[in-house]
Amino acid sequence: MAVPKKKKSKSKRNQRHAVWKGKAAIAAQKAISLGKSVLTGKAQGFVYPIEEEEEE
């Protein structure tokens, strides 16, 4: 009869989840910070094309 393989402990699983969630939290914080700086106009790492109005 087939027997499932031995699984890793819950503490190892929780440790992996904590690392993943920590990396996700850092990425989310960077995204929020970048979004705020773009909205307030303080972002200096972006170059936006200026659209010139056509005169007739």
Curated annotation (Swiss-Prot):
Alphabetical list of Pfam families matching this protein: Ribosomal_L32p
InterPro entries the UniProt entry points to: Ribosomal_bL32, Ribosomal_bL32_plant/cyanobact, Ribosomal_zn-bd
Key words, A-Z: Ribonucleoprotein, Ribosomal protein
GO cellular component, one term: large ribosomal subunit
Coiled coil: none
Lineage top rank: taxon: Bacteria
Molecular functions per Gene Ontology: structural constituent of ribosome
Gene Ontology BP annotations: translation
Signal peptide coordinates: none
NCBIfam families: rpmF_bact
Family, similarity comment: Belongs to the bacterial ribosomal protein bL32 family.
PANTHER family tied to this protein: 50S RIBOSOMAL PROTEIN L32, CHLOROPLASTIC, LARGE RIBOSOMAL SUBUNIT PROTEIN BL32C
Name of the protein in its database record: Large ribosomal subunit protein bL32
Gene giving rise to this polypeptide: rpmF
